[in-house]
Amino acid sequence: MKRYMICSLLFLTTFVFAQNKMNTRKGKIVFEASIPSFEEIRATNENVSCVLLTKTGEISSVALIKNFRFKLSLMEEHFNTNYMESNDYPKATFKGYIQGFNLNIIGSSTKKFELNGELEIRGKTKPIHTDAFLRKIEDCLEIIAEFKINTDDFDIVIPEIINSKISKNVTVYTEFLVK
């Protein structure tokens, strides 16, 4: 009987704590550094991890650099080898907070929140302040955000020979469906 009580207590404790966290391993990040009239510079990573702590609004995500896909494999190779040095810097991370987050006030209509945190790429960390748009979809929570970063902030060097074809100001779009 004592063993049954202890097992039940452990199960309930785990269940309660699990309710405070929502996550996914199938989040999406799309970035674009295109310049009009030149080749599209756009990549997508659809295997991004994201964790949201529902009690605090704390959010974090991790993207493996080598999981970004371009329309041309040569772009992917240059991105990983020359610009991001993905063997030395294999991931990008974001850690932050959704200000005023309250799961109870989010419904099927999109609700805007302020998202603040730090983005780390290539060992360099920069603050990010943007809007996040949240809504419930069945038993999941959709989190969408968009922001801009500058390649210089993360020591990403674009060779002079092609710097007129790649924008230093990169638009980053994120989409997570956490459960």
Where is each model-derived feature located?
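Bacterial Sec-dependent N-terminal signal peptides
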Residues: 1-22
